[in-house]
Amino acid sequence: MISPSTKLYGLIGYPLGHSISFYIHNAAFRALSIDALYLNIPIEPEFFSKAILGIKYLPIYGLNVTIPHKESIIEFLDEISEISNILGAVNTVYRENHKWKGDNTDFGGFLKTLEDLNLSSDFSCLILGAGGAARAVIYAVLEYGFKEVYLTNRTYERAEKIAVEVKKNKNFEIKVIPWEDREKISEKVILINTTSIGLDGKETPWNGDFKKLVFVYDIIYNPKETPLLKLAKENNVPYKNGLDMLIYQACLSWEKWFGFVGPFEVMKREAEKLL
């Protein structure tokens, strides 16, 4: 029930038609009897500056930020977390001590799923993609303790740029391999897809030998089983989609908004109804 004292939260990005954040956060508010409402706030890139300046002065207590605004939001914030600074992206905004602050829970969301899976850090990781999601995944993989990380991207230079950043920030040597050589890797690896390949339900970023793969993680969550995950299943390779990462990053936003982590099971049940 909305009341005059209902606190507003929301998601900014463009477009937002695909997002399930509205449903999972509001389901969690209802489950915990929190007098709050979560809204979709679509902002076209050309109007972003004016819109965000207005939002700063409205009684909105917290925001999630998605594509294409995760980077452009930073200049409008008073402070950002260390991980946001490293990743160059913010996905959670909150008010604290009269300041508008930013954090990145994509990193923590992926790290939490790795911890749940309890994968052996003795294996190497092969990460496909070099966008914003790849950055969060790479730093989570390093935090988890994997000793060897390979990175490949359709644009080689983008992968190289990330490798240089990681070397500077973490003193860790990522091995960059050309996209066309990704399936030639000789050792057994954990494959992590951070690209959009498979979002259409038709393509797969891996047509190589599945005997080389000890685990397949595709951060796409809709469709639930991408062509990559279907192939993993057919080849008896354990696999996971990106739904838990999505839910965990949403739950971790609550830590900034309310001082406690959001209800994972409630949010996941709601998400599964929609997918």
Curated annotation (Swiss-Prot):
Gene Ontology terms: biological process: amino acid biosynthetic process; aromatic amino acid family biosynthetic process; chorismate biosynthetic process; shikimate metabolic process
Catalytic reactions on record: shikimate + NADP(+) = 3-dehydroshikimate + NADPH + H(+)
Top EC category: oxidoreductase
EC number: 1.1.1.25
One CC-aspect GO term: cytosol
Molecular function terms from GO: NADP binding; shikimate 3-dehydrogenase (NADP+) activity
Alphabetical UniProt keywords: Amino-acid biosynthesis, Aromatic amino acid biosynthesis, NADP, Oxidoreductase
Source species, domain of life: Bacteria
PANTHER family in UniProt: BIFUNCTIONAL 3-DEHYDROQUINATE DEHYDRATASE_SHIKIMATE DEHYDROGENASE, CHLOROPLASTIC, SHIKIMATE DEHYDROGENASE
Family: Belongs to the shikimate dehydrogenase family.
Described function: Involved in the biosynthesis of the chorismate, which leads to the biosynthesis of aromatic amino acids. Catalyzes the reversible NADPH linked reduction of 3-dehydroshikimate (DHSA) to yield shikimate (SA).
NCBIfam families on file: aroE
Protein name (database record): Shikimate dehydrogenase (NADP(+))
